[in-house]
Amino acid sequence: MDNKKIRNFAIIAHIDHGKSTLADRILEFTNTVSKRDLKEQHLDSMDLEKERGITIKLNAVQIRYNSYIFHLIDTPGHVDFTYEVSRSLAATEGALLLVDASQGIQAQTLANVYLALENNLEIIPIINKIDLPSANVDKVKAEIENTIGISAENAILISAKNGIGIEKVLEAIVNLIPPPQASDEKDPLKALVFDSYFDIYRGVIIFIRVVTGKISVGDTFKFMANNLKFSVIELGISSPNQVKKEALFAGEVGWVAASIRNAKDVEVGDTITLVENPAKSPLPGYKKLVPVMYTGFYPVDSQQYNLLKDSLEKISLSDSSIIYEPESSKALGFGFRIGFLGLLHMEILQERLEREFNLSIIATAPSVEFQITRTNGQVQIISNPSLFPEPNFISEIREPYILAKIFLPEEFLGQIMGLCQDKRGIYVDLEYIDDFRRRLIYKLPLVEVIFDFFDRLKSLSKGYASFEYEVIDYQVSKLQKLDILLNGQKIDALSMIVHKDFAYPKARDLTQKLKEIIPRHSFEVPVQAVIGSKVIARETIKAYRKDVTAKLYGGDVTRRKKLLEKQKAGKKRMKSFGVVDVPQEAFLAILKTNINEK
């Protein structure tokens, strides 16, 4: 295959800007998929992706256009999935920057464009949805030039939905995106592993971009990070269905099956090379992202613990950003502490476990990693609030802070600044992008952002604000552990870390919510919020009362009293031994409480 005829590219776009639709039109226009077989969001393979209208997993597909071969790597657009975007961009030479003509550039688009610029990719600006009445092409062109600093004079105007301008996009890919670097077949193999998934018959299938050399069926290769060796049984390309080949050459994107049975053997972002003629060093520039929040996942049925363990292992193959370890809770039994990139990431994993593996999951409230200095000088990093030491053993607590960049229309500036102040934010800067749009920069505690910040941001701005963030440092904060007691028993899975100034309103709000959510029992259940040994808020869930006197037909009043006394004694006994049922909604209530309402 002539290297000069290959083009590798990704599509960068915010959610709902039409990325999956553009991918569909490209597949249709080039006859990669026949019109009869094409379905909406063709590259989005999960039902979840289609239902939510988002791309979660990245996909790679080979497209033939005239005498050229394109490798389109479809990427997610949500802030939680930046990890997936960084992988796909590392495997390409160019990117289509897709911007909605009515909404303009959003924060996440910008974050991904900067990733592309860091990778020295050729960027082609494309303005989509030009047929909408609210489209403002000139304004969007000016925005692209002012915020990104690339020329938008020759931006391609399209309507992906109606197929307008698709041919111009294909011609631009040919003319503007550079071909992969030429490489001799005899050069040592270097190939970037940018994705993987588990096939029950063939083991782990890895997706690779060959940078130098070639890889053939029968070759023995090794992963450079862990030195594990495997032999190629099958390899090929996706078009978009898998097509087997004998070899993959420099510049090509394809899949490799090598009977890899253990999920942990594959590290996405690793470099593979041949055992016979190995490369001296791996490919540069790959960064592994660290989870920003941690949550406990427990099976409702404790018998399903092993099924949950196996399911997590299988899912972690196709989502390498998930990190998990076993943990136990007095209230919930055995489960796992799982690291995520954000709340959407967590919701999607829970839905996948429930749909694909028929598991019922209880998820505890998310937390972040805190740095705790004990009074003896020892420093601990703890992400599970129930493992916090007692207050008298803590010298100081440091929490992670983020730098948040919020894009918003000027009319919502006041409300959004108010939201940031509520979340203990520190004002950094305000930039004027144009006459209508502003970029607000705040330092915020990460623990405040992972709860309901994104929802409230969208709600206050009617959906027009968007934001991106990066974790910058740890800062000392006045934090305390808030425990919840139900019927005098500490429920470790409901423990949380709160700021001293907001502990009381948070406790009051949470106890009221738990009172509404936890079903009534046949005995009275006190709900208490405590810090250390001090109760700072209390509610009582009233008992429901069975009418034990219903079967009496008049007669002696002492008989009635005797039955009521017997019921009272029974309830007293139940109260001391009774188990309180805590539904999943109780753990979610922690997310929904208005943390900082004083």
Curated annotation (Swiss-Prot):
**What is this enzyme's catalytic activity, as reactions?**
GTP + H2O = GDP + phosphate + H(+)
Q: What is its EC number?
A: 3.6.5.n1
Cellular component aspect of the GO annotation: plasma membrane
| Keywords from the named record | Cell membrane, GTP-binding, Hydrolase, Membrane, Nucleotide-binding, Protein biosynthesis
Enzyme kind, highest EC tier = hydrolase
Q: InterPro entries, per this entry? A: EF-4, EFG_III/V, EFG_V-like, EFTu-like_2, G_TR_CS, LepA_C_sf, LepA_CTD, LepA_IV
Which cell locations does it reside in? Cell membrane
Residues annotated as domain tr-type G? 4-181
Would the keyword Hydrolase be found if you checked this record's keyword annotation? yes
What are the recorded Gene Ontology BP terms? positive regulation of translation
**Entry-linked Pfam families:** EFG_C, GTP_EFTU, GTP_EFTU_D2, LepA_C
Residues reported to bind GTP: 16-21, 128-131
CDD domains the record matches: EF4_II, EF4_III, LepA, lepA_C
- What molecular functions are annotated in GO for this chain? GTP binding; GTPase activity; ribosome binding; translation elongation factor activity
* Topology in membrane: Peripheral membrane protein
- What does this protein do, in the record's words? Required for accurate and efficient protein synthesis under certain stress conditions. May act as a fidelity factor of the translation reaction, by catalyzing a one-codon backward translocation of tRNAs on improperly translocated ribosomes. Back-translocation proceeds from a post-translocation (POST) complex to a pre-translocation (PRE) complex, thus giving elongation factor G a second chance to translocate the tRNAs correctly. Binds to ribosomes in a GTP-dependent manner.
Write down the PANTHER family for this protein, in alphabetical order: TRANSLATION FACTOR GUF1 HOMOLOG, CHLOROPLASTIC, TRANSLATION FACTOR GUF1-RELATED
The entry sums up its family as follows: Belongs to the TRAFAC class translation factor GTPase superfamily. Classic translation factor GTPase family. LepA subfamily.
From the Swiss-Prot or TrEMBL record, give the protein name.
Elongation factor 4
Organism of origin = Mesomycoplasma hyopneumoniae (strain 232) (Mycoplasma hyopneumoniae)
Q: Which gene encodes it?
A: lepA
